């Protein structure tokens, strides 16, 4: 698989994501449903703590990727839904630490509410 970042305006690169990712020669595509801060039994965790919810949502995303034989390095698109979009942007260091040098296309969407006590939900598309 070949990934080519598309950034006609480079300001997003410093934030750790690309405006678009052109993927060629991939074999499989995994489309992940929204992942949030739940434990293995589906019970909501970390009410009121955006950072902890984001970390656990990433853990859950990584578990799905691993079950498909993939890692965060295979993610080409990450949609972030949050009850406070500005707070998520302030927490981008968490995403950058987990994704490392792997950049992806992303949208951060502020939403009025999420189920249960969730503050953030992640949807991902991964390819290999």
Task: Label each residue range with its predicted role.
Residues 1-59, 63-76, 82-128:
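N-terminal presequence-like segments and the immediate start of the first folded domain
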């Amino acid at each position: 698989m070949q990934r080519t970042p598309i950034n006609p305006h480079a300001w997003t690169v410093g934030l750790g994501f690309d405006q678009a990712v052109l993927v060629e020669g991939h074999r499989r595509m995994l489309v992940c449903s929204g992942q949030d801060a739940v434990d293995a039994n589906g019970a909501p965790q970390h009410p009121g703590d955006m950072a902890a919810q984001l970390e656990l949502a990433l853990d859950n995303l990584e578990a799905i990727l691993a079950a498909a034989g993939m890692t965060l390095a295979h993610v080409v698109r990450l949609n972030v839904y949050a009850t406070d979009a500005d707070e998520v942007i302030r927490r981008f260091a968490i995403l950058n630490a987990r994704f490392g040098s792997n950049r992806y296309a992303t949208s951060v969407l502020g939403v009025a509410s999420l189920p249960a006590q969730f503050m953030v939900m992640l949807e991902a598309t991964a390819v290999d």
